[in-house]
UniProtKB/Swiss-Prot annotation:
Function: Forms a receptor-activated non-selective calcium permeant cation channel. Acts as a cell-cell contact-dependent endothelial calcium entry channel. Forms a homomeric ion channel or a heteromeric ion channel with TRPC1; the heteromeric ion channel has reduced calcium permeability compared to the homomeric channel. Also permeable to monovalent ions including sodium, lithium and cesium ions.
Bilayer-spanning residue ranges: 363-383, 404-418, 433-453, 476-498, 512-534, 600-620
Magnesium recorded as keyword: no
GO molecular function: beta-catenin binding; cadherin binding; inositol 1,4,5 trisphosphate binding; store-operated calcium channel activity
Enzymatic reactions: Ca(2+)(in) = Ca(2+)(out); Na(+)(in) = Na(+)(out); Li(+)(in) = Li(+)(out); Cs(+)(in) = Cs(+)(out)
Residues engaged in binding Ca(2+): E417, Q420, N435, D438
Intramembrane residue ranges: 325-359
Protein name, as recorded: Short transient receptor potential channel 4
Tissue expression notes: Abundantly expressed in brain (hippocampal CA1 pyramidal neurons, dentate gyrus granule cells, and cerebral cortical neurons, and in the septal nuclei and the mitral layer of olfactory bulb). Lower levels are detected in other tissues.
Control of this protein's activity: May be operated by a phosphatidylinositol second messenger system activated by receptor tyrosine kinases or G-protein coupled receptors. May be activated by intracellular calcium store depletion.
Region (Multimerization domain): 87-172, 254-304
Gene for this chain: Trpc4
Gene source species: Mus musculus
Subunit structure comment from the entry: Homotetramer. Heterotetramer with TRPC1 and/or TRPC5. Forms a heteromeric ion channel with TRPC1, with a 1:3 TRPC1:TRPC4 stoichiometry. Interacts with TRPC4AP. Isoform alpha but not isoform beta interacts with ITPR1, ITPR2 and ITPR3. Interacts with NHERF1. Interacts with MX1 and RNF24. Interacts (via CIRB domain) with SESTD1 (via the spectrin 1 repeat) and SPTBN5 (via C-terminus). Interacts with CDH5 and CTNNB1. Interacts (via protein 4.1-binding domain) with EPB41L2. Interacts with PLSCR1.
Length: 974
């Protein structure tokens, strides 16, 4: 295949080697640019600064050059998290480009802050974003800094950007037909979809919601619901949208985890944001929890804090209920269940009485309703047993006593469903599958009652049941009543939700029903296909003569595939093995037809039994396992829905007492009629300003309390998120890389400090020497006419016999050499021990007038290793000659070998009282061999000898050194 990718030379042999070359070659970097980028990579601050300064002067380096990986110097510094280099590069106005996005992706908060505060030069050309070439950029055009920061979920970076006033585009709906959406989708549908996904991914960031949303709970609820709906529409990005939806749900749950008291929890769960300040609202109706159930926020609802509050309200009348023995619980529930008629009558007569208030408790209400439904099932059982039998041959039998007792329950169920639909709305009503089951059950009972009435009115004769018509109203009513009994018994499963053991099982059963419906759709298609084929094959062989029973339900099955309906029944019952194989035979000797029919029948059984049935088992197993993995959350969510239905104010009385008008219901009815029918005659009394003001104040107080609690929750959540991130971070390869980078940067910083200290010390020495020269020239007047300029450094060697001995002992030197460092003014009291402080520097030798000629050769010491022995010997001989004359001449001398050495600069100040010595700082730098101009020689005289000594400064023009001897001290200046 190589010939498809590489050009082959015609004259080359067949087994020639494939030449390789770089097809997409890029421009090479110059050595200076490579060194510049390498210095940035290693964190060499001094080299980078030097390169940037040279680039401004000589223009030899492109400071915006790119390495083979496509990184500029700024991006390399951001990747290495070197804030000093980033600040340096920005000060030289390097090209920023996507540096802010790279810093956000790298989560370098300091770099992001520097880039946000960096102001571009006014002369820089501003290119519109639409004209920028984004082909080689790592980020798509729709990625803005705030969107990328939200993707990384870095709270600090998001806060910095939000403080700058950034904004996020509002995503349009999937079915939006505006001009912008239509044009964007037509131009590039993929970019349009990815852009919407990136925006939603940013909006779903927990840090962004916590920082910018006034009501984070409501934002998380609505966004998770919207993302869940988007996952159903955009199947291409279904997994991404579902993951974002789960992220929003988890954020709401984690935020609720931060509540620390029941007061905070009640403020959160009772907050209502859909009312204005002047509208009256209840402060204890769990409005936020109802909203969470509506948006199916299972993690939020099943959160332990929320469940604890619900449980405390559920068992309000029975504190410590869960700690009681199960036998005590059962006996208590049984007694309350038996007394539910008494409680109901008391509530009808006196709703505000103790018993009337007792039945309004959620737990008591649940027990009473359950006892009422169990009584209804008991009546159904009695009706099915026909205890009070009537004449079975009567075509229109009258209702029995049990049926008369069942009728109030049926009417009570119907009235309860009507009230529920009226209060919650049709949409909320049909979303609950149990309501649909109740609707079917009540419809069957209504149809049964109607048919019973028709049969009782129309048919009164006695006829044997065998002679009745197939569609006789009594027969149809009995069939519908039997089906309704099944639904009524199965409806009891909904009460299993209250139990922790049966609740998860009931939820798994409901999920399996969905799998069964999916399976039935495919199975019906297969069933209809084979039924059509078999009926087409056996239609011509229908048997009608000599048969007392026709069909597959006969003792001897026949005509199994004669009609389409009969074929469907035969194929269905064949799954359970109830159809014999001989039904594929025909009376005629048509073996081919029998073979084809048997083959079709066998193929159907293989597909339905082996494939489809096992697929159904696998689907049901998967659904059960899914529920089992989240059994606690699913069960608590279902139980909360059951509890919330009993927390409502209405529906206190159980069936059948709910059909009896209570005094409260009659009062509400009269009030409604009076308001709607007589509203023209009477005007509504306006509320006073005081009432409106108090209501507004209460609502405003609730709002402020909610915002205060929300502020505390957000702070706790952010702190917990940061702690968790630090805990889970651990040691990674990236950390090791950062550590190496820090070590490298520290190394170059130390080297830079050493080089910088050399230059700074030289400059300070020059300044100090210049000042000293000026002072001397002013004090001496015009006695010395011409003096040469101060040299680059001023080296002073102080010689004292005792000090030299001490220095020799401490430094293991034969001549006690050391350097003198200048003391700051605040440390003048330590001048006595200055030799110990400067023992590692310069030239220090001991001189004495008595034995100068003997010790001179052994007391000269050189710090620089580059000074040759010959130069040292020559300097020694010259010094001996000068000392033999009693003075040292002054002049210009070339000092070789001081290429890289440390010297100490001595600065002396003259006062009227004393001659003080200030020891200069160490100078470490690189010097070339140069002429050193020595201006004068100043003796250093102790205080006690100051009165006996005179200024012996003597000028010499061409002497290599200038030395003045004063008793025990000799001053030598180069």
């Amino acid at each position: 295949m190589a010939q498809f990718y590489y050009k082959r030379n015609v004259n080359a042999p067949y087994r020639d080697r494939i030449p390789l070359r770089i097809v997409r070659a890029e421009s090479e970097l110059s050595p200076s640019e490579k060194a510049y980028l390498n210095a940035v990579e290693k964190g060499d601050y001094a080299s980078v600064k030097k390169s940037l300064e040279e680039a401004e002067i000589y223009f030899k380096i492109n400071i915006n050059c790119i390495d083979p990986l496509g990184r500029t110097a700024l991006l390399i510094a951001i990747e290495n998290e070197n804030l000093e280099l980033i600040e340096l590069l920005l000060s030289f106005n390097v090209y920023v480009g996507d540096a802010l996005l790279h810093a956000i992706r790298k989560e370098v908060v300091g770099a992001v802050e520097l880039l946000l505060n960096h102001k571009k030069p006014s002369g820089e050309k501003q290119v519109p974003p639409i004209l920028l070439d984004k082909q080689f950029s790592e980020f798509t055009p729709d990625i803005t800094p705030i969107i990328l920061a939200a993707h990384t979920n870095n709270y600090e970076i998001i806060k910095l950007l939000v403080q700058k006033g950034v904004s996020v585009p509002r995503p349009h709906e999937v079915r939006c037909n505006c001009v912008e959406c239509v044009s964007s989708s037509d131009v590039d549908s993929l970019r349009h979809s990815r852009s919407r996904l990136n925006i939603y991914k940013a909006l779903a960031s927990p840090s962004l919601i916590a920082l910018s949303s006034e009501d984070p709970f409501l934002t998380a609820f609505q966004l998770s619901w919207e993302l869940q709906e988007l996952s159903k529409v955009e199947n291409e990005f279904k997994s991404e949208y579902e993951e974002l939806s789960r992220q929003c749900k988890q954020f709401a749950k984690d935020l609720l985890d931060q509540t620390r008291s029941s007061r905070e929890l009640e403020i959160i769960l009772n907050y209502r944001d859909d009312n204005s300040l002047i509208e009256e609202q209840s402060g204890n109706d769990l409005a936020r929890l109802k909203l969470a159930i509506k948006y199916r926020q299972k993690e939020f609802v099943a959160q332990p804090n929320c469940q604890q509050l619900l449980a405390s309200r559920w068992y309000d009348e029975f504190p410590g209920w869960r700690r009681r023995h199960w036998a005590v619980k059962m006996v208590t529930c049984f007694i309350i269940g038996l007394l539910f008629p008494v409680f109901s009558v008391c509530y009808l007569i006196a709703p505000k009485s103790p018993l009337g208030l007792f039945i309004r408790k959620p737990f008591i209400k649940f027990i009473c309703h359950t006892a009422s439904y169990l009584t209804f099932l008991f009546l159904l059982l009695l009706a099915s047993q026909h205890i009070d039998r009537s004449d079975l041959n009567r075509q229109g039998p009258p209702p029995t006593i049990v049926e008369w007792m069942i009728l109030p329950w049926v009417l009570g169920f119907i009235w309860g469903e009507i009230k529920q639909m009226w209060d919650g709305g049709l949409q909320d009503y049909i979303h609950d599958w149990w309501n649909l089951m109740d609707f079917v059950m009540n419809s069957l009972y209504l149809a049964t009652i109607s048919l019973k009435i028709v049969a009782f009115v129309k048919y009164s004769a006695l006829n044997p049941r065998e002679s009745w018509d197939m569609w006789h109203p009594t027969l149809v009513a009995e069939a519908l009543f039997a089906i309704a009994n099944i639904f009524s018994s199965l409806r009891l499963i909904s009460l299993f939700t209250a139990n922790s053991h049966l609740g998860p099982l009931q939820i798994s059963l409901g999920r399996m029903l969905l799998d069964i419906l999916k399976f039935l759709f495919i199975y019906c298609l297969v069933l209809l296909a084979f039924a059509n084929g078999l009926n087409q094959l056996y239609f011509y062989y229908e048997e009608t003569k000599g048969l007392s029973c026709k069909g597959i339900r006969c003792e001897k099955q026949n005509n199994a595939f004669s009609t389409l309906f009969e074929t469907l029944q035969s194929l269905f019952w064949s799954i359970f093995g109830l159809i014999n194989l001989y039904v594929t035979n025909v009376k005629a000797q048509h073996e081919f037809t029998e073979f084809v029919g048997a083959t079709m029948f066998g193929t159907y059984n293989v597909i339905s039994l082996v494939v489809l049935l096992n697929m159904l088992i696998a689907m049901m197993n998967n659904s059960y396992q899914l529920i089992a993995d989240h059994a606690d959350i699913e069960w608590k969510f279902a139980r909360t829905k059951l509890w919330m239905s009993y927390f409502e104010e209405g529906g206190t009385l159980p069936t059948p007492f709910n059909v009896i008008p209570s005094p409260k219901s009659l009062w509400y009815l009269v009030k409604w009629i009076w308001t709607h029918l007589c509203k023209k005659k009477m005007r509504r009394k306006p509320e006073s300003f005081g009432t409106i003001g108090r209501r507004a104040a209460d609502n405003l107080r609730r709002h402020h309390q909610y915002q205060e609690v929300m502020r505390n929750l957000v702070k706790r959540y952010v702190a917990a998120m940061i702690r968790e991130a630090k805990t889970e971070e651990g040691l990674t390869e990236e950390n090791v890389k950062e550590l190496k980078q820090d070590i490298s940067s520290f190394r170059f910083e130390v080297l830079g400090l050493l080089r910088g200290s050399k230059l700074s010390t030289i400059q300070s020495a020059n300044a100090a020497s210049s000042a000293d020269s000026d002072e001397k020239s002013q004090s001496e007047g015009n006695g010395k006419d011409k003096r040469k300029n101060l040299s680059l450094f001023d080296l002073t060697t102080l010689i004292h016999p005792r000090s030299a001995a001490i220095a020799s002992e401490r430094h293991n030197l034969s001549n006690g050499s050391a350097l003198v460092v200048q003391e700051p003014p605040r440390e003048k009291q330590r001048k006595v021990n200055f030799v110990a402080d400067i023992k590692n520097f310069g030239l220090f030798h001991r001189r004495s007038k008595q034995n100068a000629a003997e010790q001179n050769a052994n007391q000269i010491f050189s710090v620089s290793e580059e000074i040759t022995r010959q130069q040292a010997a020559g300097a020694l001989e010259r010094n001996i000659e000068l000392e033999s004359k009693g003075l040292a001449s002054r002049g210009d001398r070339s000092i070789p070998g001081l290429n890289e050495q440390c010297v100490l600069v001595d600065h002396r100040e003259r006062n009227t009282d004393t001659l003080g010595l200030q020891v200069g700082k160490r100078v470490c730098s690189t010097f070339k061999s140069e002429k050193v101009v020595v201006e004068d020689t100043v003796p250093i005289i102790p205080k006690e000898k100051h009165a006996h000594e005179e200024d012996s400064s003597i000028d010499y023009d061409l002497s290599p050194t200038d030395t003045a001897a004063h008793e025990d001290y000799v001053t030598t200046r180069l």
